[in-house]
């Protein structure tokens, strides 16, 4: 599993760095757990102000450490890796690498929750058919009329749908322009 992670992560890092037009400072560290329960019991990052969780709430990020678990599904594992890599890159891109830079930048940069979560989810999963169906259901069945209402119901899906639209309409090169 560690060898698989190394091979996949190398390709995914290059792919995501190209999408964001940004090279990571330093190295990634991947901590892999054999199952979800081991992952949930981990105390890595507890008490750290630097602890983030991604959109699924399951990939922990501590600095450049990405904590993931393997549940028997390589597709899901790869999504966790991509989400973790995207989160680390976005954190470095927006807030800098050191704790001091992050504190200084956090006061200046304030993106809505759906914006970053949607981007991370889009990078990790793309726009699968079930998202299309879920969005259609919210609009038709639940009567969601506009983007703000969608953000209230499902902010991650709202952000993911926005990034899907932007990339489909204007191309992947626009991602870095909208983040900087």
Residue ranges and their predicted role:
Residues 1-106, 112, 129-130:
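Juxtacatalytic substrate-recognition/specificity segment
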Residues 16, 111-132, 136-180:
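Active-site-proximal alpha-helical
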